[in-house]
Amino acid sequence: MKVAPLSVVTLEYTVTDEHGEVIDTTVGKEPLVYLHGTRYLVSGLEAELEGRSVGEAFDVTLTPEQAYGQYDENLVQEVPGELFDGMEVSEGDTFVAETDDGHRPVTVIEVSEEFVKVDGNHPLAGVTLGFKVEIKDVRAATAEELAHGHVHGAGGCGHDHGHDHDHDHGHEHGGYCGGGHHGHDHGHDHGDDHGHGGCCGGGGCGAKGHQH
């Protein structure tokens, strides 16, 4: 069976940045399992996987446009600290903010007495990414998986989208990083929920969660 829309695909991968530094890998961990064609992965990686078969391995370099877009200075904004309702806020914290375009993940990059500066760019915006991928399994999705829009079972990318190794430290990264008015969402977390599948998993370096 080939990789096709609504097939369940199991991947092993390693992701590197422009300098060859490893950003994330599943080697030695659980592989990534996801429902293909649901925009879970960034567009460039999903396009490369389309039509491939179990056992195929490949390397691909994705431009920012194929991954998380170019870095947009307009997505860096100062918001009044009072919007956080007295919550303790530190640099590196990530919040799901309410904007004119809906809920958007933002990362705190600076805290002053009156303002909090947040960055709505994905942490990998503007970065060219190298993927080394091997397809371990491809199967048809179950009726339940199709109904829910995600994979069930071990390694699945369904309920726990905290695969962001990354850079969001287990906060609720999901959705486009937009501008507009930044409110706040109390789903803020200081824990490190890296999980497996950081780069290809929800919001991580292959995920479509922050896709531009």
From Swiss-Prot:
<keyword id="KW-0479">Metal-binding</keyword>
<dbReference type="GO" id="GO:0042026">
    <property type="term" value="P:protein refolding"/>
</dbReference>
<dbReference type="InterPro" id="IPR046357">
    <property type="entry name" value="PPIase_dom_sf"/>
</dbReference>
<keyword id="KW-0143">Chaperone</keyword>
<protein>
    <recommendedName>
        <fullName>FKBP-type peptidyl-prolyl cis-trans isomerase SlyD</fullName>
        <ecNumber>5.2.1.8</ecNumber>
    </recommendedName>
</protein>
<dbReference type="InterPro" id="IPR001179">
    <property type="entry name" value="PPIase_FKBP_dom"/>
</dbReference>
<comment type="similarity">
    <text>Belongs to the FKBP-type PPIase family.</text>
</comment>
<feature type="domain" description="PPIase FKBP-type">
    <location>
        <begin position="1"/>
        <end position="94"/>
    </location>
</feature>
<keyword id="KW-0697">Rotamase</keyword>
<comment type="function">
    <text>Also involved in hydrogenase metallocenter assembly, probably by participating in the nickel insertion step. This function in hydrogenase biosynthesis requires chaperone activity and the presence of the metal-binding domain, but not PPIase activity.</text>
</comment>
<dbReference type="GO" id="GO:0005737">
    <property type="term" value="C:cytoplasm"/>
</dbReference>
<keyword id="KW-0533">Nickel</keyword>
<keyword id="KW-0963">Cytoplasm</keyword>
<keyword id="KW-0413">Isomerase</keyword>
<dbReference type="GO" id="GO:0046872">
    <property type="term" value="F:metal ion binding"/>
</dbReference>
<dbReference type="InterPro" id="IPR048261">
    <property type="entry name" value="SlpA/SlyD-like_ins_sf"/>
</dbReference>
<feature type="region of interest" description="PPIase first part">
    <location>
        <begin position="1"/>
        <end position="69"/>
    </location>
</feature>
<dbReference type="GO" id="GO:0003755">
    <property type="term" value="F:peptidyl-prolyl cis-trans isomerase activity"/>
</dbReference>
<dbReference type="Pfam" id="PF00254">
    <property type="entry name" value="FKBP_C"/>
</dbReference>
<feature type="region of interest" description="IF-chaperone">
    <location>
        <begin position="76"/>
        <end position="119"/>
    </location>
</feature>
<feature type="region of interest" description="PPIase second part">
    <location>
        <begin position="128"/>
        <end position="150"/>
    </location>
</feature>
<comment type="function">
    <text>Folding helper with both chaperone and peptidyl-prolyl cis-trans isomerase (PPIase) activities. Chaperone activity prevents aggregation of unfolded or partially folded proteins and promotes their correct folding. PPIases catalyze the cis-trans isomerization of Xaa-Pro bonds of peptides, which accelerates slow steps of protein folding and thus shortens the lifetime of intermediates. Both strategies lower the concentration of intermediates and increase the productivity and yield of the folding reaction.</text>
</comment>
